[in-house]
Amino acid sequence: MAKKPVVIGVAGGSGSGKTSVARAIYDHFGDRSILVLEQDFYYKDQSHLPFEERLKTNYDHPLAFDNDLLIEHVHKLLRYEPIDKPVYDYTLHTRSNQVIHVEPRDVIILEGILVLEDERLRNLMDIKVYVDTDPDLRIIRRLIRDIKERGRTFDSVIDQYLSVVRPMHNQFVEPTKRYADVIIPEGGQNVVAIDLMVAKIRTVLEQKSVL
């Protein structure tokens, strides 16, 4: 039996440390063995909408994501076929014309706030992880990220958090914790949890390899 890639889902609230967990696991295996698919790259294309309408996008709702495309790409990677990952432009609030070519790897990490929300995605995962972090720390991290990386203002980030992010987290993100095989507090700073994850991934890889 030919080997098959291992798929790991890493979910959690905005600013919880999902990216840090994915990066910590990535560092253990290296770019020849592992790849990361960020759900943030798979927001739906909105180029057909006026800019004023795009500004109203609720990025924390499950319907904001193009999970059909993400699932299609995961299936290709499971067959060891390359994909062209979309790029999302947060300043224009729509998908960019650019893509990122991604070669298949033995380990696929699906990282995003709602990767555990869609049953179709969960069914593709060998290991499901939820990163659990204090809400105060999450909002601080989101402030820093959105102001620095997405050109947002302090007031706009706070307004969005109170009106959208927090209620969406409570309604959609937090409930997906029940699907997790592993719950990691403190994100990528939890060295013990990361080491256990790496050991588990190696075990699953061995089980999926040719005996």
From Swiss-Prot:
Keywords tagged on the record: ATP-binding, Cytoplasm, Kinase, Nucleotide-binding, Transferase
Residue intervals passing through the bilayer: none
CDD domains: UMPK (cd02023)
EC assignment: 2.7.1.48
InterPro entries: P-loop_NTPase, PRK/URK, Uridine_kinase, Uridine_kinase-like
Entries under PANTHER family matching the protein: URIDINE KINASE (PTHR10285)
Name of the molecule in the record: Uridine kinase
Organism of provenance: Geobacillus thermodenitrificans (strain NG80-2)
